[in-house]
Amino acid sequence: MQHSDGRVELRPEAAEAIRRSPLYNKDLAPVPVERRNWTTYNYAALWISMAHCIPTYMLSSGLISAGMNWWQALITILLGNTIVLIPILLNSHPGTKYGIPFPVFARAAYGTYGSNLPALMRAIVACGWFGIQAWIGGEALDTFLAAIIPGWTILLGGPIGGHMVTEWLSFLLFWGLNIYIIYRGMDLLRKVENWAAPFVLIMTALLLGWAIWKAHGLGYLLTQQSNFHSFREFWPIFIISLTGMIGFWATLSLNMPDFTRFGHSQREQAIGQVVALPTTMTLFAAMSVVITSAALVIYPHMKMDELWDPIKLVGQFHNVAVIAISMFTVVVATLAVNIAANVVSPANDFANAFPKWISFRTGGLITGVVGILMQPWRLLADPSGYIFAWLVGYSGGLGSIAGVLIADYWFVRNKRLELGDLYRTKGSYTYSSGWNWRAVLATLIGCTLAWIGLVVPLLRPLYDYAWFVGFGAAAITYLLLMKIAPPQSPEALENRHGKSRVVGEAFYAPGSDSDKAKVVEQIS
């Protein structure tokens, strides 16, 4: 049933019928139109809260440590976020139109069971990010407690595994706080985002003012020199850094339907994202560039691998109130972004893989456990590895998935989906036993080309362009395969075997009384 504004929902009898499908659970169900109430402000606040986080801060400070000056770093970040905004908006559209999350949307291209491939690939990356953010939040909580509790650092003894026992305890406490909010649900998340976003911006601005005051102005920043003296020297570091910037939000470029399915309109969700993402990312990055550069003047004894981490930087302050307030801000910001960006999608992904056994809450708990097992304290050990290994590395795989999804929805299907069939084991998206081999093959080709540079030195430039290579190769391959070997329609298969087919958007379990809905006709 399509509304005048273009949004689609199931009729009541069809919505009731899909509940009997093994592909259904309440967390994956299409959101009714009356519950799609997120406005422009909600999406702007979502991006502001996600952008104002320590990993964003580390992006710009990491580029500075790589040799860029302030304007080179900011241009790289602005361009990267502008580019990644394109697939984000393209994949946001089906969420708002059909009210479906990312794993269900992926069924259209990959098949009802094949969608587990992109969903679980995305989930693994998100688990890694969850662990990283939880470790950062734990560091902030540890610094906060050390500021207000005398002797906190040595309270429980010496270091274990390279970190103090209180650091491990703070990490587990922050991890538990994330799990608590997951079990409270999405409504609590929206409330946290609405007040956390402006609060974090104000506190960061205060820290910026302090840095400029202590460094006696911005003269140091304007005279900062780049380590690259020609375009030829700058280009290699620029392109891999740009790929890393795109990789930073490549996860959200896939699973944005998890949020836009609550959108009140296409216009509101699009405006909220266009206004908030590139501007807030660049603004926050600019703040971190100024603060980090000022810190070089204020604390000349500190190394760059310490200055790039604002938690370690604030730990140098002698004012207990400043440390406590700053770290409280970091804890709130990290909590908001971690749940929004790194829990919603993998929780839905795990629920999609096993819909009858795993709910959103259970999927969130799995995300938290896997995040610990990925050892985030090791992922953050090296600032250059954070950008050039972690971000660039996974961008090739996620870019390949984005290429397939966008090619399928916008070019193969022209934005038209059979909503009910996304929840049917036998329908338009069944393909071969629930798998569309064309999408799987296209994804594998994209990933192979994006990552082959890691093992073949001669092809290293392909890895530097990992997201672009994966996206382009997968999209082109998928379009060619769908043209050369198009899947057979379910109607043709049913005509061949003389079976019943379903007309309209509904699912009928074996043995159900389909005559009641008057939507099944016999094909002989």
Residue ranges and their predicted role:
Residues 1-70, 85, 204-207, 214-218, ...:
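Membrane-interface "cap" regions at the ends of multi-pass membrane proteins
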Residues 30, 401-477, 484, 491-495:
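C-terminal membrane-solvent junction of multi-pass transporters and transport-like membrane proteins
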Residues 40-57, 170-177, 183, 209-215, ...:
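Hydrophobic, membrane-embedded alpha-helices of multi-pass small-molecule transporters
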Residues 52-56, 79-87, 121-133, 198-214, ...:
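Selective recognition of specific alpha-helical transmembrane segments in multi-pass small-molecule
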Residues 134, 138-147, 199-226, 248, ...:
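Hydrophobic alpha-helical segments and their helix-loop junctions in multi-pass secondary transporters
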